[in-house]
């Protein structure tokens, strides 16, 4: 198994029968990826529930988003990580639980809150599949990650261990680089819009990474939830046309704007020195950039038979290529 832990099915229910559309609960449904998961679940015809957490308070944008989900056919369920019984009651309503709470320190790092959700799912006993908040780099491949960024991977592995020891059926999704964060800034940390003048290359700019449109991540995720081929496996989303280096991404942008950007380079030593000057949350994120852009951690291994790859499992799903994605910035 990709996660490296033994799996015991125990007394939990078997996977849904072929043709059955599971009832889905999305936790973190107002977040950057979560809102896309809700939309994709509804579009695929699943009875969809969204956890409405009181912690939202008077955040009008999130409240309006929840109301838009309700209008589109979703059911809102009150619940909180601070109220264990509410979690148990919420998961009892559905077959599949998808958690999309933030694992990004510059927003809010909530990965270990999922341990409460694991306990709730175990007690409820009806959940056929749990998809925890992963969606980035596969933490099982990052055992040698640097501090402080390794905390993200370590915490995700703690959650995986709890899931598997509880005998909860699962799917772990490694979606690599969110396109909005990486492509928009031409793979430069701290940028989300592409410059028309200059770009800083990380190292030689030739390390390959994998970029995935966030809407595609959501669509592939929903395809997996009733698929027995993805049960108790890690599934990578690795669109073949989207495995590109920073230089290749920059080249695509240069073709769109009809000019070459002024290029400077940032050596690994300069990057690490710059990283140490940032606060803790920034250092965590920059560590991830280091592993992706200097070490090529997303493409330096082969996907084994014990795992799966979404574009091969679902060739009927047309994914957004980097070339197509970049056009929106012109």
From Swiss-Prot:
What does the entry list as the binding residues for substrate? 288
Q: Which keywords does UniProt give here?
A: NADP, Oxidoreductase
What InterPro entries does the database record attribute to this sequence?
Answer: NAD(P)-bd_dom_sf (IPR036291), NmrA-like (IPR008030), NmrA-type/Isoflavone_red_sf (IPR050608), PCBER-like (IPR045312)
Q: What class of enzyme is it?
A: oxidoreductase
- Work out whether the entry's keyword set contains Transport: no
- Catalytic reaction(s) noted: (+)-lariciresinol + NADP(+) = (+)-pinoresinol + NADPH + H(+); (-)-secoisolariciresinol + NADP(+) = (+)-lariciresinol + NADPH + H(+)
- Give the residues the record marks as binding NADP(+): 28-34, 53, 62, 160
What is the active site of this protein? 156
Gene Ontology molecular-function annotations? lariciresinol reductase activity; pinoresinol reductase activity
What Enzyme Commission number does this protein have?
Answer: 1.23.1.2, 1.23.1.1
A GO BP term here is: lignan biosynthetic process
Quote the tissue specificity entry.
Expressed in leaves, stems, leaves and seeds.
To which protein family does this belong?
Belongs to the NmrA-type oxidoreductase family. Isoflavone reductase subfamily.
Annotated PANTHER family = NMRA-LIKE DOMAIN-CONTAINING PROTEIN, PINORESINOL REDUCTASE-RELATED
| Subunit structure of this chain's protein | Dimer.
Briefly, what is this protein's role?
A: Reductase involved in lignan biosynthesis. Catalyzes the enantioselective conversion of (+)-pinoresinol into (+)-lariciresinol and of (+)-lariciresinol into (-)-secoisolariciresinol. Abstracts the 4R-hydride from the NADPH cofactor during catalysis.
Q: What is this protein called?
A: Bifunctional pinoresinol-lariciresinol reductase 2
Higher taxonomy: Eukaryota, Viridiplantae, Streptophyta, Embryophyta, Tracheophyta
Gene that specifies this protein: PLR_Lu2
């Amino acid at each position: 198994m990709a996660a490296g832990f033994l799996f015991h099915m125990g007394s939990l229910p078997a996977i849904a029968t072929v043709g059955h559309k599971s009832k889905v609960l999305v936790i973190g449904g107002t977040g950057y990826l979560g809102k896309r998961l809700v939309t994709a679940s509804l579009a695929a015809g699943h009875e969809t529930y969204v956890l409405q957490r009181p912690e939202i308070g008077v955040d009008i944008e999130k409240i309006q988003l929840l109301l838009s989900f309700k209008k589109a056919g979703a059911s809102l369920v009150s619940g909180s990580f601070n109220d264990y019984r509410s979690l148990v009651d919420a998961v009892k309503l559905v077959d599949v639980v998808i958690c999309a709470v933030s694992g990004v320190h510059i927003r809010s790092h909530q990965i270990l809150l999922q341990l409460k959700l694991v306990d709730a799912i175990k007690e409820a006993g009806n959940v056929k599949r749990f998809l925890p908040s992963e969606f980035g780099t596969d933490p099982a491949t990052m055992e040698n990650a640097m501090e402080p960024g390794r905390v993200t991977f370590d915490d995700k592995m703690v959650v995986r261990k709890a899931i598997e020891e509880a005998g909860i059926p699962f799917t772990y999704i490694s979606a690599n680089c969110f396109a909005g964060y990486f492509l928009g800034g031409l793979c430069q940390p701290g940028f989300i819009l592409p410059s028309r003048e200059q770009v800083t290359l990380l190292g030689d700019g030739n390390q390959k990474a994998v970029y995935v449109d966030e809407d595609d991540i959501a669509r592939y995720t929903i395809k997996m939830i009733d698929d027995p081929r993805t049960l108790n496996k890690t599934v990578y989303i690795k669109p073949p046309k989207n495995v590109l280096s920073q230089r290749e991404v920059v080249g695509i942008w240069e073709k769109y704007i009809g000019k070459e950007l002024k290029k400077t380079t940032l050596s690994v030593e300069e990057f690490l020195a710059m990283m140490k000057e940032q606060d803790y949350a920034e250092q965590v994120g920059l560590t991830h950039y280091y592993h992706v852009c200097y070490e090529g951690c997303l493409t330096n291994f082969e996907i084994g038979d014990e795992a799966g790859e979404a574009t091969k499992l679902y060739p009927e799903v047309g994914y957004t290529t980097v070339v197509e994605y970049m056009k929106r910035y012109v």
